């Protein structure tokens, strides 16, 4: 007699899924397959790939004999072909004017980038020169060298006015990030209202200063981790994925934001920021509006970063972007505004 407690076996039809039919958000590409692509499109002999970083894009070190290069595979839908082309043309422009950057390397057919077909859709890829050197340290000496480098970057970037790239304007820095955050903040109305208010105050302050702000092509992500220092004290820059025409004061404020969000105290950060900004101003002037806007662009950067992360909740998970994430951001903005508000 059959056991009445036993559930009958479920009869299901066989379903077949393939990598092409099941959608993905951000796949991990096999390094052996990428090595084959690199060998074919760049003419490198027996390249070996090591994944260095999986962030907005995927960055790998490529070793072919004694030669070392960097391969970036952009995330699907992150940049249009025109935007990728702008970034690579900007790098070529800077290199041509003597700025030490990780320049793009052409494929065997002369193109600066290609497109591969991943599970989630087309993904652009590009090869870059490898920048030797050590990471910048949190010392006034390194901060000053970085400030000089930033001034040289802006000097060299002034003539570059090519179209085809998103602008690092207040819509990009404040309006769009809030739009990305709002779906996650519905669970935390006590945090949503003060975050919206902080963004409104930041926007009002920067809008008032906007007529006097310097504008031009920017790196867009000018924190110290995107630089290397050679034994000859030459600073090289890489990762121009967030570059675009924008406020020069914002470009500088990214370094300040990076320092103050590393858990250092104000007494530790201030000498670094003073050295960075002082070295920049020795080489390149800033307007009164630029100087007044710097702390407000730190707040804008904090909001931009929160929106950047919130926009990828489906990939990172909402537990990662839960209440503690937004509380940390709001606490930072509140404390920052108390020290540097209008």
Curated annotation (Swiss-Prot):
<dbReference type="InterPro" id="IPR050249">
    <property type="entry name" value="Pseudomonas-type_ThrB"/>
</dbReference>
<dbReference type="Pfam" id="PF01636">
    <property type="entry name" value="APH"/>
</dbReference>
<protein>
    <recommendedName>
        <fullName>Uncharacterized protein DR_0394</fullName>
    </recommendedName>
</protein>
<dbReference type="GO" id="GO:0009088">
    <property type="term" value="P:threonine biosynthetic process"/>
</dbReference>
<comment type="similarity">
    <text>Belongs to the pseudomonas-type ThrB family.</text>
</comment>
<dbReference type="GO" id="GO:0004413">
    <property type="term" value="F:homoserine kinase activity"/>
</dbReference>
<dbReference type="InterPro" id="IPR011009">
    <property type="entry name" value="Kinase-like_dom_sf"/>
</dbReference>
<dbReference type="InterPro" id="IPR002575">
    <property type="entry name" value="Aminoglycoside_PTrfase"/>
</dbReference>
